[in-house]
Amino acid sequence: MQRGGRRKSRLEGAATPGAHGKPHEMVERHDMDYARAFSDALARIHSEGRYRVFADISRTRGAFPKAMRHDPEGVRDVTVWCSNDYLGMGQHPAVLTAMHEAIDKVGAGSGGTRNISGTTHYHVELEAELADLHQKEAALVFTSAFVANDTTLATLQKLLRGSIILSDEKNHASMIAGIRNGGGDKTVFAHNDVVDLERKLAALPRERPKIIAFESVYSMDGTIAPIAAICALAKKYGALTYLDEVHAVGMYGPRGGGIAERDGVMGEVDIINGTLAKGFGVMGGYISGSRHICDAIRSYAPGFIFTTSLAPAIAAGAVASIRHLKVSGLERARHQERARTLKRRLKNAGLPVIDNPSHIVPVLVGDPVICKRVTDMLLDRHGIYVQPINYPTVPKGTERLRLTPTPLHTDADMDRLCAALSALWAECPVSLEQKRAAE
């Protein structure tokens, strides 16, 4: 019997065997309700109208941009207006043939990381093609452009001790992640604003390592960076330039080298990031730059070192795509014509297209719930697949449809899209005048 104090509870007094048969005191547990935490998080995005629902589709070889939609009611034909296979190269016979031949020759996977048996001859050929494309000494292939941006920017900051990154305010999430993971200093300059950029550069010591990180084509607004002016500032203030050309490679320039090639300033850019998954229609990402930079990233970047390399068939398909687009300008010319035509037709229909000089066609909605409603009705009623673009991909209040015309979209496809959008805009509570004012 306990004397001179409070009585112990059953939990405090009970003893149970420990790991080695010795008793230990039982303590009261207040477990975290993990399921509730996750369900609450999901409820928040549901309530904001930005819960993402994936459309289950199957692309049909030779029929792009047509696809088959799978849902509980069966399989139905759809026209895809939101693919990032911008030129349709994912369906090109040369790409498919190269991939089939690689699989038949060497099998499916690479068999290892790049350091441990995963550097196949296909990877070596691919990096040589990319270095040639950008007229650089070297290139380095990653499993995705997100990984390439993330691990390269983080590694640059770790290698350049005391460095600071100057980042455009509209940079992609992969660049933001890399800058954050680098753990160094950063400053953000106003979008495409060289006056603001110079003000920030001028405030830094000349001897301090500096990296200017920016994109050529910004994927949500379609704006294009003043690359020449930014490179001139980099030279003036002793900074490295890191340019993301993900939404430009394959699609701009005489050989598909991107906006920097188109503008004649590729040689002024220190590091170019690109993708193999958009203009080239396959998968993967890369950087291209000097031999020393690429070798340093190869040797230090965890996102490159500690992962299995791309499948040989993917590398083979990418090589075929790059080689084709280096000599063929037909896809690029048709792509630009289709983008101009779609913008003109949407504007003529009174729809609030965000004007820009690139192939991106954003149509402003400004409300996440309405944006989702419009895209659902496009898909269910008209067989037109457009994915809604909501926060955090774009700022709240700027929710939009992001249309991506390809060389393979026909005038008839545009007729159906414009007619459907006009009808839905009249039906949904979207004020065109308000949205025009918001541009």
Language model features with spans:
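Active-site phosphate-binding strand-loop segment of PLP-dependent enzymes
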Residues: D85, T187, H191-L243
